[in-house]
């Protein structure tokens, strides 16, 4: 359906702790309903404005949701949300909305988000799928925590391009009908 949801583990904060009451929704439920097209992007936006988004009972995660039109919603339980409409969006395993809250939990040398942002800033208005994969390849992880899937969505083509297990010479394409 063109909806994509990415959940990333993050060090939790008390404000996002799981709560089981009607005014709350877990980040996992929000993401799952969006990916399954049970809710639209606009519905997700309304939900984050009206309800408290909390962690799942057994995991602390944040999410990036995007639709076929290229609209992006970053949701961090207990911290807030942000709608992005630029040419690209980034998320990582620490807070984007309140980075100072997760600074104590950063792994030394894990500067992929910063390196990616820097690389992206060097591109002009013309930014291709090939350019995006060059950036992803430059910041990929290897070893035990290796990047398993890297993907790029082209809103213009309504297609997602992806690479599995860092095999950047084998870019696959899936077009949404």
Where are these regions (language model features)?
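C-terminal, well-structured catalytic/ligand-binding subdomain of enzymes
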Residues: 1-36, 61, 66-177
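Short arginine-rich
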Residues: 52-60
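Short N-terminal edge-element motif at the start of the domain
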Residues: 20, 31-49, 53
């Amino acid at each position: 359906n063109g909806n994509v949801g990415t959940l990333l583990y993050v060090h939790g904060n008390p404000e996002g702790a799981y709560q089981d009451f009607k005014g709350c929704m877990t980040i996992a439920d929000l993401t799952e309903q969006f990916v399954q097209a049970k809710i639209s992007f606009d519905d997700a936006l309304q939900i984050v404005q009206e309800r408290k988004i909390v962690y799942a009972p057994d995991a602390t995660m944040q999410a990036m949701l995007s639709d076929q039109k290229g609209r992006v919603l970053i949701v961090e339980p207990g911290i807030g949300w942000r709608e992005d409409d630029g040419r690209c969006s980034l998320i990582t395993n620490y807070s984007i909305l309140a980075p100072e809250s997760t600074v104590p939990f950063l792994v030394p040398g894990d500067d992929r988000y910063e390196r990616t942002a820097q690389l992206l800033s060097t591109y002009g208005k013309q930014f291709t799928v090939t350019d995006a994969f060059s950036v992803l390849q430059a910041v990929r992880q290897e070893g035990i925590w290796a990047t398993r899937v890297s993907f790029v969505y082209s809103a213009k083509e309504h297609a997602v391009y992806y690479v599995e297990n860092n095999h950047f010479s084998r870019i696959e394409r899936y077009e949404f009908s």
